């Protein structure tokens, strides 16, 4: 089912959670992000971000936190592999995904 058709129908929580993971993985693959920058960029609550990132493995995406400094939380997330997911497909549909999950995709750069 195309994303446009899915967006017009009622979408399950699971489907939105799946799309949220794809969107976050896209952001992490494009730039270096930590929880704070993802929170500012997406407006998603910190706990939602943590839960989504922790569940990446459920859909085959492997992510790691790269320590960048002395503090434990100083660093960024890096996508190790997209697994069975086509990152090119996500890149092509990122605006649609963002609209469905309620995020403004045009604000993908931090000021």
Sequence positions of predicted segments:
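Key DNA-contact positions within bacterial/archaeal DNA-binding proteins
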Residues: 47-50
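The alpha-helix within a helix-turn-helix
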Residues: 38-40
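Pre-recognition alpha-helix immediately N-terminal to the DNA-recognition helix
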Residues: 19-26
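Residue-level detection of the helix-turn-helix DNA-binding "recognition helix"
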Residues: 53-58
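Short, Lys/Arg-enriched N-terminal segment that forms or immediately precedes the first helix
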Residues: 1-13
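Short Lys/Arg-enriched helix C-cap and helix-to-coil transition segments
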Residues: 61-76
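Helix-turn-helix/homeodomain-like alpha-helical modules used for DNA recognition
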Residues: 81-111
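Short capping segments at the starts of secondary-structure elements
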Residues: 30-34
